[in-house]
Amino acid sequence: MNKKKAQRTFIFGCLAPAVILAILFIAVPTITVFKESFFDKTDLIHDGAFVALDNFKVLFSDERFIESMQNIILTITLVTLVTLILAILFATLLTREEFRGKNFFRVIFYIPNILSIVVIAGIFAAIYQPSNGILNSFLEVIGLSGLTRAWMGDPDIVNYSIIVALIWQAIGYYMVMYMASMSSIPENLYEAASLEGAGKIKQFFMITLPLIWNNIRTTLIFFVISTINLSFMFVQINTEGSLGTEVPLNYMYNKAFAGNYSYGMAAGVCIFLFSFALSGILNNITKRDVLEF
């Protein structure tokens, strides 16, 4: 009895710091954001009148907010699809294929993930620089000067330029996650499939993909959360939301710290509900029976 009590005390003691930190830095701020969104406060310090849902009514009629939501939906969709495909492709090649320099490529692919978003923004500012940037210079060298653009200054393509940077930053992280799952798949499954005449492509779709599916489902949630956060930082550093690049967190930031604190919190509530709902939808539509080996 005393042993069980000691074990229970030890478990609670280990969990307590994490629970306390989660309450202080996640639960309390989230509740505060919801509460403040119903008031008319200009800043964090001064009180404001209770306005119920007025902030939300104004928010949903603001074309800038609607455009920012369209931008983040486009960004999440493209970043998720392209990163998912490339990360799985590279993970498969580095796990299932034998060639020289595998460890080198693992390191190269992962390097962008250890760089801060500020460094990545600086790298792509140099790449996209219109007059003597790396990309335009390369296009001129290979005789495609007609394709040169102001990559971060043209409203028609600037969002796609940002998306490319976010994809480059994310591939290595998800590749490593998928490699970890693929490495745990028993080799005898592939050997049996080969004896049955299954080629590598069929083996991928019949063995690899089903057995790493739960990992893919988990990473889809990461895609949503990380893209919302990283797109804000990248946009804030490079364009500050101009040229139609504003995403919801930029919109929230600009409003909350420009004398519309409660209105910015209302935008924050919408962003939270959007990310929560999208994560739930992705979790449900990708749900399938767990395959074990």
Residues covered by each model-derived region:
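A structural signal for multi-pass alpha-helical bundles of membrane permease subunits
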Residues: 3-293
